[in-house]
Amino acid sequence: MAKRDFYEVLGVERGASEADLKKAYRRLAMKYHPDRNPGDKEAEDKFKEANEAYEVLSDASKRAAYDQYGHAGVDPNMGGGAGAGFGGASFSDIFGDVFSDFFGGGGGRGGARGGAQRGADLRYTLDLDLEEAVRGTTVTIRVPTLVGCKTCNGSGAKPGTTPVTCTTCGGIGQVRMQQGFFSVQQTCPRCHGTGKMISDPCGSCHGQGRVEEQKTLSVKVPAGVDTGDRIRLTGEGEAGSMGGPAGDLYVVVNVREHPIFQRDGKHLYCEVPISFADAALGGELEVPTLDGRVKLKIPESTQTGKLFRLRGKGVAPVRGGGAGDLMCKVVVETPVNLDKRQRELLEEFRKSLQSDTSHSPKASGWFEGMKRFFDDL
């Protein structure tokens, strides 16, 4: 079964902060921890899945590799380092950590103040020809996104005015709510955590601080990419709000079908039609490769479906390593539209085979097997 996206496992956006990741992980860990679900295999699997996702995303280097290459970037078999164990997280550790936050402990772990929010990450599907994917290329794309409003410089306020302090939270961005015996701190519902209110909004962005725009970008595609590979353009996602950083743009590669070649990782496959005569007598023919035509020697008595390997004529992987091979599968074509002379020759040839089955070992074996089958009935 294919692994789920780690961000999806934790239920967070790709631009999630470390605090958001930890909060999401603790929530899942408390729910599915084996100490709370003894003997529940499904809960144990979900706990392992959450643990593996958090192990990768909480590590800056592993997260960067995952964002760039997906699961392959952190696969131990490909040089990555993600594991899938329990990671040593006990239920008491997780449980205590949550209550520390709930009662206001942890030295200010209640989240960012001031309302600054990171912009959303964007996804763009880039269609490439096989030749472009194999050799690499540079393409220009246009991406609809949100950019900072130039009229108000992203503040959302009309030029010449400034936001005023929120009267609900007094500019703190947080309010305290009484829930039974506990006093819980929450984001201010009026200013949404900014601590400011815009009394006279900007006419260009209507107080949002961002406007829609088509952004033109140049994307350098490395040689060897394949369908599903992602190219991360840092800071090219949506602009942040209230001074927050921009998100990232993920360019997802989609390689179009090729009229001749099929790709499987670093190897290429193609079918090569050959004549009945060439299959029987042998010969030499030209076959296409991504580097041009090459000669392929066909030995006599070649059967349809035989594979010929052209070493090094495949694809050099984007993450390094030697190029793959081109696998040519020969397909023997039955001649059609025969003239009178050709039919006479084939009739004569067929008669010559009827008295000698050594020329058709597979057919001879099949008929012998069929005869034994009916004899045994």
From Swiss-Prot:
GO terms for molecular function, please? ATP binding; heat shock protein binding; unfolded protein binding; zinc ion binding
Record's GO cellular component, any one?
cytoplasm
Q: Which Pfam families match?
A: DnaJ, DnaJ_C, DnaJ_CXXCXGXG
Which residues are Zn(2+) 2-binding?
166, 169, 188, 191
> What detail does the entry give on cofactor binding?
Binds 2 Zn(2+) ions per monomer.
Q: Does the keyword Hydrolase apply?
A: no
> Where do the ZnF regions (CR-type) fall?
136-214
- Which SUPFAM superfamilies does this UniProt record tie to the protein? Chaperone J-domain, DnaJ/Hsp40 cysteine-rich domain, HSP40/DnaJ peptide-binding domain
Q: Per the entry's comment, what about the domains?
A: The J domain is necessary and sufficient to stimulate DnaK ATPase activity. Zinc center 1 plays an important role in the autonomous, DnaK-independent chaperone activity of DnaJ. Zinc center 2 is essential for interaction with DnaK and for DnaJ activity.
- Subunit arrangement? Homodimer.
Q: What is this protein called?
A: Chaperone protein DnaJ
- The organism named in the record is Pseudomonas paraeruginosa (strain DSM 24068 / PA7)
Q: What is the lineage of its organism?
A: Bacteria, Pseudomonadati, Pseudomonadota, Gammaproteobacteria, Pseudomonadales
Q: Name the gene.
A: dnaJ
